């Protein structure tokens, strides 16, 4: 799997409470032509084991505004329990679905409970 730093949402981002990804990806100006294409490959994984929290749910969100005032969730995981959130765990969203219309894309991590440790890495990748 190959990460491009300009296409990363999170690089070892600590999650102790609900938060948006550190980075937002700008898909470009309106009326762009990025081809018919296919789903965009996405990797979201645990880079350091979580402790303290109850669960995490990951959502892919899009918006026409970089501030995400009217974010639309296009796909999300179920709530993943703490017992599964060990280093190496991969969340079950493997791509950004086709037809995402907003200019900006980010991830949102919904944390239940109070986390004391744990990090995620996420981004658009080649070679999953």
Q: Each predicted region: which residue ranges?
A:
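Surface-exposed, low-hydrophobicity beta-strand/loop segments enriched in small/polar/acidic residues
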Residues: 1-128
